[in-house]
């Protein structure tokens, strides 16, 4: 059956979403993005170049195109209420309403929801609304804290005591952002990502993924939106036991049930970022959409019709039989401008070489007269797929190394050495 789908967003995540939808030749794609993503544009029937939060322009475009459904990529339009407005116009969405999106956009709401419903995995926390309250708690707390702005930060706004700042630095950072912060116990362990399709009641998990936030090899340098990620052929990670996986899945299932019980049912993609600690998985945060880069890992493995999954989520009858992933490993490597993230060099030309069997996803890149140029954020990503992690990494690394220009990437993502480092760290904690 023909289906017209609106895709909102223009990054690498949205290119992955668009490609997955386009695997069904009966699906017609219409796109809204602030800047033209050449990969998305080539797969779209029509493109509206407009800021994704400019809902007054998005709604008429969607209705004029006659779309049957929308898929929302980034978090900002969710916070702006794009799903509510689309549904008022008769267009259902893969994405939560503004109220349900608070699971990501309001960290205080998220923690209080978990506390009210007795959901496991919630770290010790304190919500502060002014700098003086934050100062008193930071200075009196026995241990290190994570200082988190209550609202959206693009994944780059958290300061961790003992890693980024000391006590005085934490107090100053809380003051700089106005004192509206969530202060949480610093979690020690290994991070992992569990994403799931959610129809308001039913939750179908995707393969586990591990992202790499630090800019440089060896996990050093400033935090970024994510330099790359990997997943294994068994859809697990070697430092996450089956028991800990089941605990994380239960936390997400309980969170969806809590949202439904409070009258704000959650429909869309639920992204759980967990720290696997000595006590088991703890929730670092929830996101109300696919991760970037993690979307590229899981959607590169999706064997089911993505448009069909969207339809089942909208209808509220999602079942495990609707979702199937290939039993393969994936490695995603982002190329970023020289100087990223602090002083990225924009407007530098790029040349793609022979990238073999890798999948290419365009992100913050501009095509002018047939030549690609860097912008100020992550440029493009390659995903390698293979029977083993080593095979997938070799495909991704060969592709990433084929690009010439003022860009760099982390060569260590997906290598046996970095995986063993993660496992050794987990063994030391336990």
Swiss-Prot record:
EC number: 6.3.4.13
Cofactor(s) this protein cannot do without: Mg(2+); Mn(2+)
PROSITE patterns hit by this protein: ATP_GRASP, GARS
Pfam families on file: GARS_A, GARS_C, GARS_N
Species the sequence originates in: Methanoculleus marisnigri (strain ATCC 35101 / DSM 1498 / JR1)
Keywords assigned by UniProt, alphabetized: ATP-binding, Ligase, Magnesium, Manganese, Metal-binding, Nucleotide-binding, Purine biosynthesis
Pathway as given in its UniProt record: Purine metabolism; IMP biosynthesis via de novo pathway; N(1)-(5-phospho-D-ribosyl)glycinamide from 5-phospho-alpha-D-ribose 1-diphosphate: step 2/2
GO terms assigned for molecular function: ATP binding; metal ion binding; phosphoribosylamine-glycine ligase activity
Cofactor note: Binds 2 magnesium or manganese ions per subunit.
Binding site for Mn(2+) 1: 273, 285
Binding site for Mg(2+) 1: 273, 285
Catalyzed reaction equations: 5-phospho-beta-D-ribosylamine + glycine + ATP = N(1)-(5-phospho-beta-D-ribosyl)glycinamide + ADP + phosphate + H(+)
Protein name from the UniProt record: Phosphoribosylamine--glycine ligase
